[in-house]
Each structure stands twice: as C-alpha cells, then as structure tokens.
Amino acid sequence: VFQSSGDTEVLGSMLQRWPVEEVLAELRGMFAFVWHDAETREVIAARDHFGIKPLYYSCRPDGTLILSSEIRVIRFLLDKEAKVNRRALAQFFRWGSVQAPDTILEGVHCLPPGHLLRWKEGRLEIKRWFTPKWPAQNEWISSPQDQLAAVRQGITGSVQAHLVSDVPVGV
C-alpha cells in the first residue's frame, strides 16, 4: 500500500522489485531519476526517451560522481575547477545549441536522451536503453484520411497522458 499519490513512490517500489531495464520499459512520459541501490552499492540514473528532463553528471578523478538536473549545481560544487569546454562553445556559436553528452563545462556531461548511467566503486558505464522503432515500409499509412486520424489519435493520447498530475493543471 502506497503512502502518497506521487509517482516517485511508485518508481521507487518498482526499482526495488525489478531490474532497471524492465522498469524503464514500463515508463512513459518525461523523467530523469537517480536511484541508489544500498544492497549492491550501485548508483543508477536514467533519462526519458526524448530527453525532455535534463540530467547532468561529472565523474571526478577521485571516483566521486556528481549528479544534478541543473548544471549550475554541478558548477557550484566544482567551484574553481570548472572550465569552459571550448569545443562545446564553438558548437553553440555555430549551431545555437550544445548536443549531449557535451555541455558548456569541461568534465560535465549531459546524459543523452534514452540512456542509462550506472556507477559503482568509481566505475562509470553509460548505455542506451531506448531506441525508436520505426515501422517497416509495408506498415506505412498511405491514405491521407488515415494519416490524419493517426496523428489526431497520437496527439490526443499524448496530451491526455501529460495532463495527469499531482497538482491541478490548466490549459
């Protein structure tokens, strides 16, 4: 029996019972989370399918891992050690953005969308957990009316799913 109506409690319960890959396969929507498994002494972090929620990390030379949903927190913790990533700066000036895993700070990375981070005893492993499944050409919808209906159904379903909240939502 859950003590709250929040999704965080449900996620924690799932992560206690099942491997993280199975939990991720069940999640829908936007999320970024960090989980510490006290039994295995492993830190697990994951980011949603399309990277809507950010997750930054820095693995220090001494093996310490810093994680945050805001880069400024990591910048603060690194203090004087934080330096500008010149390659990312050039990327920003050229394209107007910096692509994950790069960030504007050297040694600070953004976990890419649909990726999973595992950290144990100073060892960092990052792997992709989500790959979009594109329909085969023989599964394409050819009729404009059917295409319109499929798009309408997809958008309506997505909006309805995102209107579910712990607090009142207004449109």
What are these regions (language model features)?
Residues 1-171:
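Cysteine-centered catalytic environments shared across enzyme families
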